[in-house]
Regions:
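Active-site neighborhoods and metal-handling regions in enzymes and metal-associated proteins
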Residues: 1-375
């Protein structure tokens, strides 16, 4: 079985996104946006260069002007194939020409521009030298909501990715665990994600026994034993949108303590989910989940934020973390993933992707959050 891949986006979809981004830039007091290769460029245009090099590629969005993509001439044929290409003007440049001058010709000489967080320093310095009176702001800090609120087509893709992750979990529960290396189970996870439609697999955490106390443990050569708690955290991209799911299974019968801690984490995850509704600050989701774990006496062992946004990448704004006062808005999608990590012993994490609805939240993962016994 493979998850159904939604219909592809159209040039009109990308045109609408670029127009929305340009309006947001103007509302933020910016003269324009300078978007380097990466998630923002993919989201705005559908274009992902096959290789990011020292040659400048940059989307220029200026309110009131047609979008322009500055691109090396040798990359222009591929850029022209991007779904969003009909909605913008390609401005190619050849080796020996100054790409910063090509860019500067489209910009105000003393404007303030939002620039991609992942833009190379050499390109920012080149622009600053060419436009010495200009200034720059982090695109993410200036426009934190640019990709945070998903439309129906994006939600459909995230739901498909979540369904594929659910199907993967249902099947991984059936494979042998005891006597196999973590890396072997991780390979099973990757294979199943691909079988269920993922074009990329970004991570397959299999953290058994004491390794489970490390939230970002990389699956290795440890042989899984009977009596182990095993944290599974896996995801990637399907149809260009992310999945990210965590469940914790037990090899054989768990102890009373292991069941109790799993129940605490499950209750914390449920509390975080129940806190999701429009207008609630992001930090309240973190507080709700964290309170359950703290009240149970394990607050010191919950060592990360409760959640992160997801979309064309598996980690992006908004973040469910103390101090984040951004109100939740219908269409936002993010993880709710509390955990307890006991050093040298074991860990437990339960994670679903949740979307904000008009009257609360909706899970995009439907597999059981109860303790599952595996062989």
């Amino acid at each position: 079985m493979t998850a159904r891949t939604p219909a592809p986006f159209t040039a009109d979809d990308y045109r609408a996104r670029m127009e929305r981004a340009a309006r947001a830039a103007a509302d933020a007091g910016l003269a324009g946006l300078l978007v380097a290769p990466g998630p923002d460029l993919v989201w705005l245009t559908g274009y992902a260069p096959t290789a990011v090099t020292e040659r400048l590629t940059l989307l220029v969005l200026v309110p009131g002007q047609d979008p322009a993509l500055i691109v090396p001439a040798l990359e222009a044929p591929d850029a022209a194939k991007a779904t969003g290409a009909p909605a913008l003007t390609l401005r190619d440049w050849t080796d020996g020409k100054d790409p910063y001058a090509v860019t500067a010709a489209l910009l105000e000489t003393d404007g303030r521009f939002g620039i991609s967080d992942n833009a190379w320093a050499m390109h920012l310095l080149g622009l600053a030298k060419t436009l010495p009176d200009s200034s720059y702001a982090s695109l993410t800090e200036a426009l934190p909501m640019l990709r945070a609120v998903k439309d129906e087509a994006e939600l459909e893709r995230l739901a498909a990715a979540g369904a594929a992750a659910d199907a993967t979990y249902e099947e991984i529960r059936k494979v042998p665990f005891a006597g196999r290396k973590e890396s072997e189970v991780a390979a099973d996870l990757a294979r199943l994600l691909r079988e269920h439609g993922h074009e990329t697999v970004d991570f397959t955490i299999v953290a058994s026994g004491p390794n489970g106390a490390n939230p970002h443990h990389e699956a290795g050569d440890r042989v899984i034993e009977r009596g182990d708690m095993v944290v599974l955290d896996f995801g990637g991209l399907l149809g260009g949108y992310g999945s990210d799911t965590s469940r914790t299974v037990h090899v054989g019968e768990p102890t009373d303590e292991e069941r109790r801690i799993h129940d605490i984490v499950r209750e914390a995850q449920e509390a975080g989910f129940r806190a999701v509704r429009p207008g609630v600050p992001c930090q309240e989701v973190d507080r709700a989940a964290r309170a359950v774990i703290t009240d149970a006496g394990y607050g010191a062992y919950f060592i990360h934020r409760t959640g992160h946004g997801i979309g064309v990448t598996t980690h992006e704004p908004p973040y469910m973390i103390e101090g984040e006062e951004q109100p939740l808005v219908p269409g936002m999608c993010f993880s709710v993933e509390p955990g307890i990590y006991l050093p040298g012993r074991f860990g437990v994490r339960i994670e679903d992707i949740v979307t904000v609805t008009e009257d609360g939240g909706r899970r995009l993962n439907e597999t059981t959050r109860e303790m599952v016994i595996v062989d």
